[in-house]
Curated annotation (Swiss-Prot):
Subunit structure and binding partners: Tetramer of two alpha and two beta subunits.
Species this protein is from: Vesicomyosocius okutanii subsp. Calyptogena okutanii (strain HA)
Reactions listed under catalytic activity: tRNA(Gly) + glycine + ATP = glycyl-tRNA(Gly) + AMP + diphosphate
One of the GO BP terms on file: glycyl-tRNA aminoacylation
Name recorded for this polypeptide: Glycine--tRNA ligase beta subunit
Amino acid sequence: MNTQDFLLELGCEELPPKNLQHLSNALTYNLTTEFDKLKLSYSSVESFATPRRLAVLVNGLQLQQNNQTIERKGPLISELDKAIEGFAKSCGVARNMLTQKAFGKIQYYFFTKQQIGLKTIDLLESVVNTAIQNIPIAKPMRWSNLDTYFVRPVHWLIMMLGSDVVPASIMGLISSNITRGLRFTDECIFDIICAKDYQKTLLEKAQIEVDFDMRKAIIRKQIIHVAQNNNATAVIDESLLDEVCALVEYPCVFSGNFSSKFLDIPEEVLISVMKSYQKYFHMLDMNGNLMSSFISVANIESSDLSVIIDGNERVIRSRLSDSEFFWIQDKAYTLEFRLDRLNQVLFMKSLGSMGDKAKRIEILSGYIAGVIGANVKDSSRAGLLCKSDLVTDMVGEFADLQGVMGGYYAFNDGENKAVSVAISEHYQPRFSGDSLPNTIEGLVVSIADKLDTITGIFGIGQGPTGSKDPYALRRMALGLLRIILESKFHINLKELISESLNAHLSVVNTNKANDIYQFMMERLRSYYKKHEVSMQVFDAVLAVCPESPYDFHLRIRALNTFTNNQELENLIEINKRISNILKNCSDLSIKVDDSVLIETAEKTLFKATKILAKRISNSINYTKNMKELIALKDMIDEFFDKVMVNTDDVELRQARLNLINWVRSLFLSVADISYLV
């Protein structure tokens, strides 16, 4: 089979850096999908992406489709002539060109023909055009007078098969083997001689590393080297590194400085300025303290690097001066003073202002603190003030610092440490895998804030539907549940939801409590799925309706102890025997009239379970409880072997059925074992 390497390059205006990898992956996927549809084989695929180009190299692409035998099944041979003639006509042949063939035990007419495989070079224009059109682009652009759309205007197109140019016209461009170098070096134009040498040619002639991962590794290495030269450690944020890599074709890393006076500003502000606005990497000294220095990546190697450094230092100096001004101005007014301004900030239509939300968080934080034993006064105070930083100049400029700046301002106002820290960390966890607040007051306010949003939005009928979750309530609920589980808080979730709904007064529909609870349970299901807990185990616990998520967790953990061992088999066997006896019974009770029991086995079982019930009634050591319940197996077996449950004595029969039901209730105090079968 003859093969050649196929190269596609789209030369664009600067592509959006945060979408570069997505665009590259989509183009590669679409291209290989089209080849697979056409049954064109290839040995491997390489993707390349820089700010100005998307490229794909398909190694060992089959040069022609394989010949195929096309067989089409027609009518029965016993069909009317009209049907047979019609089938032949639809195939474009005379009737005598049809063949007869058994399909199962019945004879049919078939049309068979040999289809010669098409040459790959004749298919590539359509393949590439389809691959480009199928790239998902949120905001496509149109340019020139062409009826063509793409994420950015495309200025050149390379399509090569081996060393030959593939003739094609796509997006108004004629394919060639000509590419371009760096924009800032007179944009040299040169040829790609052979598809397989694409990466090597760009590196040698234009110093452009088109492989995203290799370019990223080069940048990382240079950053580490520059930091070492500054006797520092660079903090390399992976998402920032990806973004910077998507901004440069020829990376040149350098460091710069700013005045140490700016270190008086909270370091989160400095880092945000460097990272979010300037795309800089910050450095720490040997003691782990933030330095008044930064690392940046230029898109060219300058003959006079000092010019680039001076320019960057001038820009960040201006940025930090603004931040210093915000910091000084914001400290002039306390968070409490700003509460009035919160009343002018809308939280959500029908749910009032941010001031209303702050008051609800204050009430709910006090309630939660009382339940779990946290400081009610500090929790309530932090809840009231936690949103006041939203009306500060600093948070107006750096929205990602909300909460963090509130903590600094609270401390500046003279609020105690517990209140200040709780305010600073109450947004945590912000995303999956994020750390939880470190203080109990922070945990309390975080729960209150998240639950207030969830109950409010559900209460006005705008909860998540299907795949749509515009207010990120699923993520919020998962964060809330993580706090309760990982902090081991014994909180009744139904009561907590009711308290939150009541805090909204008449604004929301309080009948939504059950919907919210079910929503939270589904998020809990997702949490355990992620942690590879069997859904049978989850459903077994869910069936007994524990209302505390942490209590739910303890039951899950207990059942997991017994999976895949003999004790689980014993559990299932006990449950099966009990269920078989009780499945058609009604009017059951767990109150046993032991005065009518006559057999030793039933008396022994009742006495043992009565003693055990007292031991486990208030115990949340469910693993121990289950072990003690499993230990009843021999007594239960003896009861079933020696006692006739369905006796003619109605009173005795009822007592025995109630005894069995009583035993079942003890097992249900942990979970419904029937779900494990």
